[in-house]
Amino acid sequence: MIISFYYGWKKIQPFNLEVRSKNLTVSVIVAVRNEEDNINRLIQNLKSQDYNPSLFDIIIINDHSIDNSLEILKNERLKCSNLKISSLEKNCIGKKQAILKGVKLSSSDIILTTDADCKFSNSWISNMVNKFSNTDINLISGPVAYHLEDSTFANMQSLEFLSLVGSGAACIGLNKPVFCNAANMAYRRDVFLEVNDYINNNVFSGDDVFLLHHIKNKYKGSILFLKSFESIVYTKPLSNIKDFINQRIRWAAKSNSYKDFDTIVVALLIFLSNASLVLLLLLSPFNF
C-alpha cells in the first residue's frame, strides 16, 4: 500500500501558474457557526487575494450562530462589496445544507470552499481555479495542513493528518480518488447541481467525499490534486484528545454509507494496518 501511495504521489505533477484562468467566475463559500473570533481575519485574507475582484464573490452562510458572528459579517459587508451573507432556515442545519444554499445563491462558474478558521496565501484562488481552464476538469482537491504548534499532541495530529492528505492525493494520482477535504476544494457549479440529488442526504456530514465519489463515477479522470505550496490551506489542530476521538467517530460513522469500491478497499487496508500496529504493541511485552 505504501509503495502504491508513493507511486501515486510521484505521478502528480507539481503545479506552476503559467497561464491565468480566463474570465472564470468564482464563489468562495464558507459555512460559519459561532466564528466571531475568525471572521475578520478570514474576510481580510479573502480581500487580499490576487484574483481579479470583479470575477469572484464571497458567500458566507450563517449556520444558526448564537455569538456575534452575524453582526460582524454585517459590518464587514459595508466594507466589502463582493461579500454576500445569508442564514440557514430553522429547519436546515449543518455544513452540508449551508454549502448547498451557498451554491444555489451563486451564479459563478467555480465553487471554492474553505472553513472560517483557515488561512491561505494571497494566490490561493488563482492557483485553485487555474486548472479549470481545462474543460475536462470538474473537481480539484487542494492540500490542507495543520499549523505547527508547540505541543506534542498538536504535532502528532499534524503528522497523522498529513498522512491522510497525502494518501488522498496519492489515490487521485492513481486515478482512484477516495477522499478530499472541503477546507480546500473547488468544483464546477453546474456539475455539483447535476450530481447533488444523488448525494446521500441521510448522512449529516461528509458531503465533500460523497461529491467526489459521484463526480468520479460520472466523469472519470476529471479530478485533480493540486501539488502546490501556495495552495495549502492551514487550519488548527484539535485542542484535546476528546475532540480528536469525537472527530474520528464522526468520520467513521459516515463510512457505512460509502459505496465506492476504491474507498472501501483503502479504508480496509488502513484499518488492518492500524490494527496490526496495535496488536504488535500489545504483544511486545511478551518478547522480553
Where do the PLM segments sit?
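Cell-envelope/extracellular polymer assembly enzymes that use nucleotide-activated donors
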Residues: 24-27, 57
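A conserved acidic beta->alpha catalytic loop
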Residues: 62-71, 118
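Catalytic donor/gating beta->alpha subdomain of glycosyltransferases that bind UDP-sugars
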Residues: 132-165, 193, 198-263
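Alpha-helical bilayer-embedded segments of polytopic membrane proteins, i.e.
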Residues: 1-5, 255-288
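Short aromatic/hydrophobic "clamp" motif used to bind/position activated sugar donors
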Residues: 111
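Short, acidic, metal-binding catalytic loop of nucleotide-sugar glycosyltransferases
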Residues: 44-55
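N-terminal membrane-anchoring/stem segments of glycan-assembly enzymes
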Residues: 1-22, 158, 167, 280
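Glycine-rich, basic loop-to-helix element that forms the pyrophosphate-binding segment
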Residues: 88-106, 127
